[in-house]
């Protein structure tokens, strides 16, 4: 099902050719989003994100740089779990992991690029391959947050990339190399 994401009022993620990192924007306003924020009635905020290849947890405006893996300091795609207790991130050249808010690794997910939380127990990302010049295959995969279960949602022949999740509807959107945006609705 092809849908105009602006009409869906969901977050869109896209990659700019001149930059190496993924930018997210609110589809309704096109306002850039750099992080997820969870707020409580007391006004406290907790955010997890990556900036300049650093993994950062921000609590009420106070930033703390995490170093969950000893032999790397380059991180991408950091995000806070829906329950606010864990951080999902990719260590460049190492793989994707889940850690607690202090940086203790809780699970190794393995190779999964552009990972996003689907819900508190599942993650969606892409498993892509290239030949050095262009993408040769890319599938959208759902993985349990402990890394033990894996399910292919879109086969690699589709060259499905950069999944985005709308948690309230349970839908997953991804783009193809041709520029199409496809929306999946998972059976409950």
What do these predicted ranges mean?
Residues 1-188:
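Sequence signature of WD/YWTD-type beta-propeller architectures
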